[in-house]
Regions:
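N-terminal strand-loop element at the rim of the active site
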Residues: 5-64, 151-155, 161-164
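A conserved mid-protein helix/loop that constitutes part of the nucleotide-sugar donor-binding site
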Residues: 14-19, 202-227, 334-335
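Short, structured helix-loop element that forms part of the nucleotide-activated donor/catalytic region
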Residues: 41-45, 229, 237-264, 349
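Donor nucleotide-sugar binding/catalytic pocket of nucleotide-sugar-dependent glycosyltransferases
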Residues: 52-53, 132-186
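A short, well-ordered alpha-helix in the C-terminal region of glycosyltransferases
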Residues: 190-193, 335, 342, 349-364, ...
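Aromatic "clamp/platform" in nucleotide-sugar-dependent glycosyltransferases that forms part
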Residues: 270, 289
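Short hydrophobic beta-strand element within catalytic cores of glycosyltransferases
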Residues: 306-309, 319
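Conserved acidic donor-binding segment of nucleotide-sugar-dependent glycosyltransferases
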Residues: 321-322, 326-333, 342-348
């Protein structure tokens, strides 16, 4: 019995669904479809599944979208899956439409994050209608968390039932992988030496794409003021872990200049293994404008780091104010600065947040729980469609 999982770009299959595809392949024949590149090859080798490369544009591109749609349709007709299950917006729209055209009985889409709530005018209307079209072609719809579910309801995207798997998130956290003890003292000391981190440094870390939507402009502005404060009792550093995407939602020129010129800001680019950087850091700062259910906040928590996050979907579900982190308003560098200064100066609060961080991830987002709940959902849908498992 065959299941096809799709995403717009291969990094989503490679990172967001790491391990899950291999788990599912123990019960089904699993095929992964995304943009064809070395990351998709890595998915195939690591997960032990067949992969097929199809380029899908992330932005609105009608002609290229039609080409991708018919390529998917052709593959679905050839592969004959029982279930197609998509993540990410464009792959969701194209997969659901192609799946319906090809007569696939079970067409599932997981909304991992919504773009339209942060847009206005004509662009917002177009995005809303695209998601409505996606939902009309899907048989089953899964918001990644309660916040995403609420937005789908509030904007009347669909009247179909909406179900959150387990406690939310598409893949959960591998707590044996994101374990502080996995990074040795020697590894930490070597990395600190490379990055010139001293014992007196309080290290903030951000992990993600360096774009405006991730709140990087506000983060750099807030940190710049803190780092230049001559009266601070501790020195500070900010690690930026992630690619700079200049073609999509570029940073403000003054932000780019500050990143280049401030010696306390370390722009380290994309890192395949983020654990060592969590291990030498003291707190995650994640002031994103929109998310579905951000893995990085859970990963940081599993590594024992408290987080400062914006009050958005997912972030405000993972973080409980004053328990395992702090929640600040979106697009507010002043409030972000206050929160960073608070966590920097209030030792008792910081220790409380730090102690709670891993247990609060462990109790809610263990990976095996989410995988088994998804498997259970697949089997339920097959039974409802009178398909023998």
């Amino acid at each position: 019995m065959k299941i096809i999982r799709t995403s717009t770009i291969s990094i989503s299959l490679n990172v967001l669904l790491k391990g899950q595809l291999k788990f599912l392949s123990g019960f089904f024949e699993v095929v992964g479809i995304s943009s064809g590149d070395e990351l998709l090859d890595e998915v195939s080798q690591r997960e032990g599944i067949k992969t097929i490369g199809i380029n899908m544009e992330r932005g609105i591109s009608p002609l290229k979208d039609v080409i991708s749609l018919f390529k998917l349709y052709s593959i679905f007709r050839s592969e004959k899956p029982i279930i197609v299950h998509s993540i990410t917006p464009k792959a969701g729209l194209l997969t659901m439409l192609a799946g319906k055209m090809a007569g696939i009985p079970i067409r599932m889409h997981t909304f991992t994050g919504l773009i339209f709530p942060t847009r206005k005018g004509l662009v917002q209307k177009v995005l809303i209608n695209m998601d409505r079209l996606l939902c009309s072609a899907a048989t089953n719809i899964y918001p990644e968390g309660q916040g995403v579910k609420n937005d789908l309801l509030n904007y009347k995207i669909t009247s179909k039932p909406l179900k959150v798997i387990a406690n939310g998130n598409v893949n959960g956290i591998d707590l044996n992988y994101f374990l502080p003890e996995k990074i040795s003292v020697l590894q930490k000391d070597q990395l600190k030496k490379e990055l010139n981190i001293t014992a007196s440094d309080f290290v903030f870390v951000f992990v993600g794409r360096l774009v405006g939507d991730k709140g990087i402009n506000e983060l750099v502005q807030a940190f710049s003021q803190i780092s230049k404060n001559a009266n601070r009792s501790k020195s500070v550093k900010l690690l930026l872990i992630g690619p700079l995407e200049e073609h999509l939602d570029p940073l403000q020129p003054e932000t780019v200049q500050e990143i280049k010129n401030n010696p306390d800001i370390l722009d380290l680019g994309f890192q395949k293994d983020v654990r060592p950087y969590f291990a030498v850091s003291d707190a995650l700062v994640f002031p994103s404008y929109r998310e579905g259910f951000p893995n990085v906040v859970m990963q940081a928590g599993a590594m024992g780091l408290p987080s400062i996050v914006s009050d958005i979907n997912g972030c405000n579900e993972i973080i409980v104010e004053g328990q395992n982190g702090m929640i600040i308003p979106v697009k507010n560098s002043d409030k972000l600065k206050v929160a960073m200064e608070k966590i920097l100066s209030d030792t008792d609060l910081y220790q409380k947040l730090k102690i709670n961080s891993r247990p609060m991830i462990q109790s809610r987002y263990e990976q095996s729980v989410i995988w088994n709940e998804l498997l259970k959902e697949y089997k339920t849908l097959l039974k409802e469609n009178n398909i023998d498992v």
